[in-house]
Curated annotation (Swiss-Prot):
PROSITE patterns: C_TYPE_LECTIN_1, C_TYPE_LECTIN_2
Binding residue positions for Ca(2+): 382, 384, 386, 389, 400-401
Membrane-spanning residues: 50-70
Subcellular localization, as worded in the UniProt entry: Membrane
Entries under Pfam families matching the protein: Lectin_C
Protein name: C-type lectin domain family 4 member M
Organism: Symphalangus syndactylus
Amino acid sequence: MSDSKEPRVQPLGLLEEDPTTSGIRLFPRDFQFQQTHGHKSSTGCLGHGPLVLQLLSFALLAGVLVAILVQVYKVPSSLSQEQSEQDVIYQNLTQLKAAVGELSEKSKLQEIYQELTQLKAAVGELPEKSKQQEIYQELTQLKASVGELPEKSQLQEIYQELTRLKAAVGELPEESRLQEIYQELTRLKAAVGELPEKSRLQEIYQELTRLKAAVGELPEKSRLQEIYQELTRLKAAVGELPEKSKLQEIYQELTRLKAAVGELPDQSKQQQIYQELTDLKTAFERLCCRCPKDWTFFQGNCYFMSNSQRNWHDSVTACQEVGAQLVVIKSAEEQNFLQLQTSRSNRFSWMGLSDLNQEGTWQWVDGSPLSSSFQRYWNSGEPNNSGDEDCAEFSGSGWNDNRCNVDNYWICKKPIACFRDE
């Protein structure tokens, strides 16, 4: 056997402490692998385990650091890209704003209008082509008809003349003349279809002017209303030009009407006749008609103003006992006459008016309702139904509603009694 000794293998001596340092140092010899034989090889492999773990840890740490650095470098690049995109958007908005600002120009408005027109046609709001043509033709015909009418000022003047003619209405001429005028108007209505042509309008206007000058007073009011309605219907029938034969017939009727009106008595003569009839009637009433003692005569009626006082119901009875009524007012003249009598004597006096049957609905004792034209005779703020006031009285310069159980003076009314000496 040889005396030389083989060096001992120290499997766990990979790391040795350097006495000059406080840390652990690696020596080159530690990385030299020594060949072992037999059971010593497994022990050497176990000695290299911690080194492998350390290497893996260093590799993982390095990978994490690299990833962080990459992200850090990417952030400025992303921010720069976003900034550039914002710049592009801002530029687009600026251009859009400038384009909108130019919309007010006439050319842009025209373009918009054309687009809207095309849109309307596309939506289907316009009628089909055949209907458009029909509508256009109707409008053309309407325009042509309107163009043939006389000018507005002349039509207005004609209407004013007819209004003045109506205002000139007075009383009834003799019956034969009335019948003749009525027949002429009837023929005129039947003959008229539509207005004559514009050239004839002036002639008709002149005829109406002469007719107005010749008219003194038209027939009585009831007949006048009928004639006015006929003239209104005649106006409604106005349209376009009638045929020549009908036009001739219209002129003939106007001529007859003018002749009939020309024979009427003038207005001054009619007024004189009316005045004479009024005077004659008054004289007859004074000579042949009498009111009872203590009664006052006015316009064909007799009035009794009491000197004592009663409530409203007893006043009604008192008038009935003498063949009269608690006064029922029929005209403004009668109201003025009675108001003057009561105001002179400074007496509150009952009249035959109440709303006993229905609150707010005033009615005379003869059953007739209070005319709306008489509402102006109430004193200011009356009737107010203060304290169940249902009966009307003369009070001062007007009417007042008062409680029916209050005692007042009263006024009776009855027609005058006329007689003949035998």
